[in-house]
UniProtKB/Swiss-Prot annotation:
Gene: zupT
GO molecular function: metal ion binding; zinc ion transmembrane transporter activity
Function noted in UniProt: Mediates zinc uptake. May also transport other divalent cations.
Superkingdom of this protein's organism: Bacteria
Residues annotated as binding Fe(2+): N120, E123, N149, E152, E181
Protein name: Zinc transporter ZupT
Catalytic activity: Zn(2+)(in) = Zn(2+)(out)
Taxonomy of the source species: Bacteria, Pseudomonadati, Pseudomonadota, Gammaproteobacteria, Enterobacterales
Subcellular location: Cell inner membrane
A single Gene Ontology CC term: plasma membrane
Family as reported in the entry's similarity comment: Belongs to the ZIP transporter (TC 2.A.5) family. ZupT subfamily.
Length: 257
């Protein structure tokens, strides 16, 4: 097994660290659940608007029309998917003065996992391809990706565990997002290698950024407020942004990104 592939596998596996952190101790309260959802929204917003979309637009040969167009397609694609799902909007699924029903959280977990997985898949490809061309650079990217994946795993596992009380279920959903990154690296190892088109990768990143922004604003933040109306979900959002921002600072400090 090649070193670039091992780096990609380890970076993706860091998601499980966050998942285990999300299920330690007693079942989280509604306040913790709401904070976790806000935390996840903060992660997605900062990654999408401060990392993925700018990186896509800065790609050589990428026009602003294509970049922003793919971002809008991602936004519209999310809302189209949301309308196709057989349930009401998540904040309508949480009964007043009751615990949030597991079904609504499960649906949110599916969408959250989908959004993070779509982000992680090209990230896995990028980690492998970069490490293949420059091993030192690959080590730095793998480290930054692992730092990203730990809070992402926590953000998925926390809400699912709070809703179901099942550690296995929480780790399962969190693990899917990490496996998407591993799958991207394996696919690059088997098929793509250094032939990944920068324009195609940039277009995918822009669209995924749109999906993640829509998911954060329309799904996660309203549900967090509905679950715990006495507290502001913005605290979780700001905390998630801070954690992701710190990882980006580390990334820039080591000369990457």
């Amino acid at each position: 097994m090649s070193v670039p592939l091992i780096l990609t596998l380890l970076a993706g596996a860091a998601t499980f660290i966050g998942a285990f952190l999300g299920v330690l101790g007693q079942k989280p309260s509604n306040r913790v659940l709401a904070f976790s959802l806000g935390f996840a929204a903060g992660i997605m917003l900062l990654i999408s608007l401060m990392e993925m979309l700018p990186a896509a637009l800065d790609t050589e040969g990428m026009s602003p029309v294509l970049g922003y167009g793919m971002f809008i397609i991602g936004l519209l694609g999310y809302f189209g998917l949301d309308r196709l799902l057989p349930h009401a909007h998540p904040q309508d699924l949480v009964p007043k003065r009751q615990q949030p029903i597991p079904g609504s959280i499960k649906r949110t977990a599916v969408l959250l996992t989908l959004g993070i997985s779509l982000h992680n898949f090209p990230e896995g490809i990028a980690t492998f391809v970069t490490a293949s061309s420059n091993l030192e650079l690959g080590f730095g990217i793998a480290l930054a990706v692992a730092l990203h994946n730990i809070p992402e795993g926590l953000a998925v596992a926390g809400p699912v565990y709070a809703a179901t009380g099942s550690k296995r279920t929480a780790i399962f959903w969190a693990g899917i997002s990490g496996m998407a990154e591993i799958f991207g690296g394996v696919l690059a190892w088997l098929i793509l290698g250094s032939l990944v088109s920068p324009i195609v990768m940039a277009a995918i990143m822009a669209a995924v950024a749109g999906i993640m922004v829509a998911l954060s604003v329309d799904e996660l933040m309203p549900l967090a407020k509905e679950i715990d109306p006495n507290n502001n979900p913005s605290y979780g959002v700001l905390c998630g942004m801070s954690v992701m921002g710190l990882s980006l600072v580390i990334l820039q400090t080591i000369g990457i990104g």
